[in-house]
């Protein structure tokens, strides 16, 4: 009987420690959680109301992608296929920062995103801003 109780206690301790480790890891975010292909939807709500869809990849904190906006340039051409590069970081609490720098591709603006990853680490919500005084909301999903 003592052996049965002892073996049951040992198995219970092992299972409890594994469950605790799983749930501790589940709640924290790491750089690897950003890696992959994402699609983001934005809505500017302050200076020049418009929407945007951006598709991008993140690898080792480096961001590359393109955006389509519901705006036109001075000649009336739609602002679609705009390329950008940037950087992304994430904290253990799953708050993240991401930049979209359009300047290397002839567009004079950088957008900064302040995001919160969902606990499944496959979606986010947040806000963004740029140097022109634009302010908006953002949400996205990992593909």
Which stretches of residues belong to each language-model region?
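N-terminal glycine/threonine-rich, aromatic-flanked beta-hairpin/loop signature
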Residues: 48-95
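A short local loop/turn or secondary-structure capping micro-motif enriched for an aromatic residue
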Residues: 72-76, 105-108, 132-136
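Short beta-strand segments that buttress and anchor functional surface loops
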Residues: 39-43, 67-69, 97-104, 125-129
